[in-house]
Amino acid sequence: MKVGIIAAMEEELTLLVDRLDNCEEVQLGHCKYYTGQINGVEVGLMRCGIGKVNAAIGTTLMIDKLKPKCLINTGVAGGFINEMNVGDIVISSSVRHHDADATAFGYELGQIPDMPSEFQADRRLVEMATKVNLKSKARIFEGPVFSGDSFIHTTEQVENILKNFPQIMAVEMEGASIAQTSHLFNIPFVLIRSISDKVRETKSADTYTQSMEESAKNSVQVVFEMVEQLKEGM
């Protein structure tokens, strides 16, 4: 069983790298790629960089090098629903672009031509993630995650996304490209994102800066528990 784990930033990946046995590091273009074992499971860790293009490149490199049985995207996200607190976890039920628009040709808003309108996360991976017992007070939610190449922090941005996608639970900048690449290569995936800021609040960028590193620890804990479960396969 080989598991691919992808994060955008070093801060989102460091705790996982520290737990790797027999760790080897390789630079692949702009991406840092680590291989080794966690709890006896062979894993690849990829720091892909921020944004959808970087994420697609990193995911493709990961698939080519590791040939994983599944992909997990870990990191942080902005929360859209009021019940969520900073540090809570969102497990993706589905993932979608919020900044794609080919509606002139009959596609849904957020749909890339010739792609599904949204990418469904693997139900087995979702169920594994949602059943994890966190050691912290953080809660686990499941719902739609949306991606775009902008940090969402203004009232105008928030209102525009809510108008078009009222079902949104969280927003970030890589997941839809990771999901789309996984879809193209027919590899099961799931996003595990910890809430670093609440986008409807003022100064969400400040909250992100202050809480990002601590919030990322919660998503990493879910990943550790999932890897343990994946010892038995999917």
Swiss-Prot record:
Function field: Catalyzes the irreversible cleavage of the glycosidic bond in both 5'-methylthioadenosine (MTA) and S-adenosylhomocysteine (SAH/AdoHcy) to adenine and the corresponding thioribose, 5'-methylthioribose and S-ribosylhomocysteine, respectively. Also cleaves 5'-deoxyadenosine, a toxic by-product of radical S-adenosylmethionine (SAM) enzymes, into 5-deoxyribose and adenine.
Organism field: Desulfotalea psychrophila (strain LSv54 / DSM 12343)
Protein name as annotated: 5'-methylthioadenosine/S-adenosylhomocysteine nucleosidase
Amino acids binding substrate: 78, 152, 173-174
Lineage: Bacteria, Pseudomonadati, Thermodesulfobacteriota, Desulfobulbia, Desulfobulbales
Gene designation: mtnN
NCBIfam families named in the record: MTA_SAH-Nsdase, PRK05584.1
Record-annotated active site: 12 (proton acceptor), 197 (proton donor)
Biological or metabolic pathway of the protein: Amino-acid biosynthesis; L-methionine biosynthesis via salvage pathway; S-methyl-5-thio-alpha-D-ribose 1-phosphate from S-methyl-5'-thioadenosine (hydrolase route): step 1/2
Keyword terms of this UniProt record: Amino-acid biosynthesis, Hydrolase, Methionine biosynthesis
Family membership: Belongs to the PNP/UDP phosphorylase family. MtnN subfamily.
Superkingdom of this protein's organism: Bacteria
An example Gene Ontology molecular-function term: methylthioadenosine nucleosidase activity
Gene Ontology cellular-component terms listed: cytosol
Keyword presence, Ligase: no
EC identifiers of the protein: 3.2.2.9
GO biological process: L-methionine salvage from methylthioadenosine; L-methionine salvage from S-adenosylmethionine; nucleoside catabolic process
Catalytic activity of the protein: S-adenosyl-L-homocysteine + H2O = S-(5-deoxy-D-ribos-5-yl)-L-homocysteine + adenine; S-methyl-5'-thioadenosine + H2O = 5-(methylsulfanyl)-D-ribose + adenine; 5'-deoxyadenosine + H2O = 5-deoxy-D-ribose + adenine
